[in-house]
A protein has these predicted regions:
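N-terminal glycine-rich phosphate-binding loop and ensuing alpha1 helix
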Residues: 2-49
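Residues that recognize and position ribonucleotide moieties
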Residues: 14, 95, 102, 173, ...
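Short, high-confidence coil segments that cap the C-terminus of an alpha-helix
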Residues: 42, 90-91, 119-121, 207
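Short phosphate-binding loop-to-helix
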Residues: 46, 52-97, 101-114
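A conserved hydrophobic position in a structured secondary element of the catalytic/binding core
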Residues: 49-50, 104, 175, 223
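Conserved core of the sugar-phosphate nucleotidyltransferase
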Residues: 106-191
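Conserved alpha/beta core of the MobA/IspD/sugar-nucleotide pyrophosphorylase nucleotidyltransferase superfamily
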Residues: 166-239
Protein backbone atom coordinates (compact mmCIF):
# COMPACT_ATOMS: atom_id res chain seq x y z
CA UNK A 1 0.00 0.00 0.00
CA UNK A 2 1.58 3.26 -1.15
CA UNK A 3 1.31 6.20 1.24
CA UNK A 4 2.96 9.45 2.27
CA UNK A 5 3.64 10.98 5.69
CA UNK A 6 3.05 14.61 6.62
CA UNK A 7 4.17 15.89 10.02
CA UNK A 8 2.58 19.19 11.16
CA UNK A 9 4.90 21.29 13.32
CA UNK A 10 4.10 24.69 14.84
CA UNK A 11 6.41 26.84 16.96
CA UNK A 12 3.55 28.41 18.87
CA UNK A 13 2.88 26.40 22.02
CA UNK A 14 1.66 28.09 25.19
CA UNK A 15 2.86 25.26 27.44
CA UNK A 16 6.20 24.59 25.73
CA UNK A 17 7.43 27.44 23.49
CA UNK A 18 9.53 26.47 20.44
CA UNK A 19 8.53 22.86 21.09
CA UNK A 20 9.62 21.28 17.75
CA UNK A 21 13.15 22.62 18.20
CA UNK A 22 13.65 21.39 21.76
CA UNK A 23 16.70 19.17 22.19
CA UNK A 24 16.14 15.54 23.15
CA UNK A 25 19.51 13.95 23.83
CA UNK A 26 21.29 15.51 20.86
CA UNK A 27 18.42 15.69 18.36
CA UNK A 28 15.51 18.10 18.12
CA UNK A 29 12.00 16.85 18.75
CA UNK A 30 10.99 17.28 15.11
CA UNK A 31 14.12 15.47 13.92
CA UNK A 32 13.28 12.47 16.09
CA UNK A 33 9.73 12.35 14.72
CA UNK A 34 11.02 12.51 11.14
CA UNK A 35 13.64 9.82 11.80
CA UNK A 36 10.92 7.45 13.04
CA UNK A 37 8.64 8.24 10.10
CA UNK A 38 11.45 7.53 7.65
CA UNK A 39 11.77 4.02 9.09
CA UNK A 40 8.26 3.28 7.81
CA UNK A 41 7.45 2.28 4.24
CA UNK A 42 6.28 5.79 3.37
CA UNK A 43 6.81 6.98 -0.19
CA UNK A 44 7.79 10.40 1.17
CA UNK A 45 8.02 12.30 4.47
CA UNK A 46 7.37 16.05 4.73
CA UNK A 47 7.17 18.49 7.62
CA UNK A 48 4.38 21.07 7.28
CA UNK A 49 4.99 24.23 9.28
CA UNK A 50 4.02 27.88 9.59
CA UNK A 51 7.53 28.81 10.78
CA UNK A 52 10.52 29.88 8.72
CA UNK A 53 12.67 28.89 11.68
CA UNK A 54 11.51 25.29 11.36
CA UNK A 55 11.94 25.44 7.57
CA UNK A 56 15.57 26.51 8.10
CA UNK A 57 16.16 23.80 10.69
CA UNK A 58 14.73 21.12 8.39
CA UNK A 59 17.03 22.32 5.59
CA UNK A 60 20.01 22.01 7.94
CA UNK A 61 19.18 18.40 8.81
CA UNK A 62 18.15 17.36 5.30
CA UNK A 63 14.41 17.08 5.87
CA UNK A 64 11.75 18.01 3.30
CA UNK A 65 9.55 20.82 4.64
CA UNK A 66 6.85 23.12 3.29
CA UNK A 67 5.61 26.48 4.56
CA UNK A 68 1.86 26.71 5.20
CA UNK A 69 -0.42 29.51 6.32
CA UNK A 70 -0.09 30.66 9.90
CA UNK A 71 -3.79 30.50 10.72
CA UNK A 72 -5.79 27.30 10.35
CA UNK A 73 -8.88 26.24 12.30
CA UNK A 74 -7.57 22.69 12.75
CA UNK A 75 -4.57 20.54 12.00
CA UNK A 76 -6.60 18.82 9.29
CA UNK A 77 -6.96 22.14 7.47
CA UNK A 78 -3.17 22.51 7.50
CA UNK A 79 -2.83 18.98 6.16
CA UNK A 80 -5.25 19.71 3.32
CA UNK A 81 -3.30 22.82 2.34
CA UNK A 82 -0.07 20.80 2.44
CA UNK A 83 -1.47 18.26 -0.02
CA UNK A 84 -2.42 21.10 -2.38
CA UNK A 85 1.06 22.63 -2.16
CA UNK A 86 2.68 19.26 -2.81
CA UNK A 87 0.18 18.47 -5.60
CA UNK A 88 -0.60 15.03 -4.23
CA UNK A 89 -3.14 13.03 -6.25
CA UNK A 90 -6.69 12.77 -4.94
CA UNK A 91 -6.52 9.00 -4.36
CA UNK A 92 -3.25 9.06 -2.40
CA UNK A 93 -3.19 8.03 1.26
CA UNK A 94 -1.69 10.48 3.77
CA UNK A 95 -0.59 9.45 7.26
CA UNK A 96 -0.66 12.43 9.60
CA UNK A 97 2.05 11.87 12.23
CA UNK A 98 1.95 14.31 15.13
CA UNK A 99 5.03 16.51 15.39
CA UNK A 100 5.34 15.96 19.14
CA UNK A 101 5.59 12.12 19.12
CA UNK A 102 9.35 11.40 19.15
CA UNK A 103 8.94 7.65 19.66
CA UNK A 104 6.18 6.86 17.18
CA UNK A 105 6.55 3.23 16.09
CA UNK A 106 7.17 2.95 12.32
CA UNK A 107 5.12 -0.25 12.35
CA UNK A 108 2.12 1.75 13.54
CA UNK A 109 2.47 4.01 10.51
CA UNK A 110 2.65 1.03 8.16
CA UNK A 111 -0.25 -0.72 9.89
CA UNK A 112 -2.47 2.34 9.53
CA UNK A 113 -1.85 2.29 5.79
CA UNK A 114 -2.75 -1.41 5.65
CA UNK A 115 -5.94 -0.75 7.65
CA UNK A 116 -7.00 2.06 5.31
CA UNK A 117 -6.46 -0.22 2.33
CA UNK A 118 -8.19 -3.29 3.79
CA UNK A 119 -11.26 -1.34 4.93
CA UNK A 120 -11.34 0.95 1.87
CA UNK A 121 -11.53 3.66 4.53
CA UNK A 122 -11.24 7.42 4.11
CA UNK A 123 -10.12 7.91 7.72
CA UNK A 124 -8.22 5.63 10.11
CA UNK A 125 -6.51 6.11 13.46
CA UNK A 126 -4.77 4.39 16.39
CA UNK A 127 -5.50 3.58 20.01
CA UNK A 128 -3.89 1.92 23.01
CA UNK A 129 -4.99 0.83 26.48
CA UNK A 130 -5.85 3.40 29.12
CA UNK A 131 -3.88 3.48 32.34
CA UNK A 132 -5.57 4.30 35.64
CA UNK A 133 -4.73 8.01 35.86
CA UNK A 134 -5.85 8.60 32.26
CA UNK A 135 -9.42 7.38 32.82
CA UNK A 136 -10.47 10.63 34.53
CA UNK A 137 -8.11 12.91 32.59
CA UNK A 138 -10.12 14.97 30.09
CA UNK A 139 -6.95 15.76 28.17
CA UNK A 140 -6.83 12.07 27.23
CA UNK A 141 -9.32 11.36 24.45
CA UNK A 142 -11.17 8.05 24.66
CA UNK A 143 -12.67 5.91 21.92
CA UNK A 144 -14.85 2.82 21.76
CA UNK A 145 -14.61 0.12 19.09
CA UNK A 146 -17.89 -1.33 17.81
CA UNK A 147 -16.85 -4.22 15.54
CA UNK A 148 -14.43 -4.93 12.69
CA UNK A 149 -12.18 -2.06 13.82
CA UNK A 150 -14.97 0.52 13.42
CA UNK A 151 -15.04 3.35 15.99
CA UNK A 152 -18.36 3.73 17.78
CA UNK A 153 -17.61 7.11 19.35
CA UNK A 154 -15.00 9.50 20.76
CA UNK A 155 -15.19 11.44 24.02
CA UNK A 156 -13.06 13.05 26.70
CA UNK A 157 -15.30 11.43 29.32
CA UNK A 158 -14.73 7.71 29.95
CA UNK A 159 -18.31 7.32 31.23
CA UNK A 160 -19.74 8.59 27.93
CA UNK A 161 -20.17 4.90 26.98
CA UNK A 162 -19.14 1.70 28.81
CA UNK A 163 -16.04 2.78 30.84
CA UNK A 164 -14.48 -0.69 30.84
CA UNK A 165 -14.44 -0.69 27.03
CA UNK A 166 -12.84 2.74 26.64
CA UNK A 167 -9.47 2.97 24.91
CA UNK A 168 -6.93 5.79 24.71
CA UNK A 169 -7.06 7.52 21.35
CA UNK A 170 -3.71 8.32 19.76
CA UNK A 171 -3.98 11.36 17.50
CA UNK A 172 -2.37 9.81 14.43
CA UNK A 173 -4.58 9.60 11.36
CA UNK A 174 -4.63 8.28 7.84
CA UNK A 175 -6.73 10.00 5.16
CA UNK A 176 -7.31 9.89 1.43
CA UNK A 177 -6.42 13.25 -0.12
CA UNK A 178 -9.84 13.78 -1.70
CA UNK A 179 -11.49 13.11 1.67
CA UNK A 180 -9.21 15.66 3.33
CA UNK A 181 -10.41 18.33 0.92
CA UNK A 182 -14.04 17.32 1.54
CA UNK A 183 -13.52 17.37 5.31
CA UNK A 184 -12.29 20.96 5.41
CA UNK A 185 -15.28 22.10 3.34
CA UNK A 186 -17.72 20.78 5.95
CA UNK A 187 -18.83 23.20 8.66
CA UNK A 188 -17.77 22.44 12.21
CA UNK A 189 -20.36 20.12 13.74
CA UNK A 190 -22.08 20.47 17.10
CA UNK A 191 -20.28 17.46 18.59
CA UNK A 192 -16.96 18.73 17.28
CA UNK A 193 -17.46 22.04 19.07
CA UNK A 194 -19.01 20.62 22.25
CA UNK A 195 -16.33 17.93 22.70
CA UNK A 196 -13.46 19.91 21.17
CA UNK A 197 -12.69 16.92 18.92
CA UNK A 198 -12.35 17.62 15.21
CA UNK A 199 -12.80 13.95 14.24
CA UNK A 200 -16.45 14.29 15.28
CA UNK A 201 -16.98 16.40 12.16
CA UNK A 202 -16.37 13.29 10.06
CA UNK A 203 -18.62 11.06 12.17
CA UNK A 204 -21.39 13.67 12.28
CA UNK A 205 -21.31 13.72 8.48
CA UNK A 206 -21.81 9.96 8.32
CA UNK A 207 -18.20 8.96 7.75
CA UNK A 208 -16.92 5.74 9.33
CA UNK A 209 -13.59 5.90 11.17
CA UNK A 210 -11.60 2.71 11.68
CA UNK A 211 -8.95 2.16 14.35
CA UNK A 212 -6.37 -0.45 15.34
CA UNK A 213 -4.33 -0.93 18.46
CA UNK A 214 -0.81 0.48 18.49
CA UNK A 215 2.09 -1.94 18.68
CA UNK A 216 4.40 0.77 20.00
CA UNK A 217 6.09 0.72 23.39
CA UNK A 218 6.07 4.46 24.09
CA UNK A 219 3.11 6.79 23.56
CA UNK A 220 4.49 10.14 24.64
CA UNK A 221 3.25 13.43 23.26
CA UNK A 222 5.65 16.18 24.34
CA UNK A 223 3.45 19.06 25.52
CA UNK A 224 5.10 20.23 28.75
CA UNK A 225 8.53 20.59 30.32
CA UNK A 226 7.94 17.41 32.32
CA UNK A 227 7.06 15.55 29.09
CA UNK A 228 10.31 16.83 27.60
CA UNK A 229 12.34 15.55 30.53
CA UNK A 230 10.67 12.16 30.26
CA UNK A 231 11.44 12.09 26.52
CA UNK A 232 15.10 12.81 27.26
CA UNK A 233 15.18 9.93 29.74
CA UNK A 234 13.62 7.54 27.20
CA UNK A 235 16.00 8.67 24.46
CA UNK A 236 19.00 8.03 26.71
CA UNK A 237 17.60 4.61 27.57
CA UNK A 238 17.19 3.73 23.88
CA UNK A 239 20.59 5.03 22.77
Amino acid sequence: MSFRVIIPARLGSSRLPNKPLKDIDGKTLIQRVVDQAKKSNAKSVHVATDSNQIIDHCAQIGVNAILTKVHHHTGTDRLSESCEILKFKSDELIINVQGDEPFIDPKDIDNLAVLADSRAANMVTLYTDLIKDEVVDRNVVKLWIKCQDKVEDFSRNATHLEPSMAKKHLGIYGYKVDFLHTFVEWKQSKNEIDRDLEQMRAMDNGEDIFAIKSSGQYHLGVDTESDLQRAIEIAKKLS
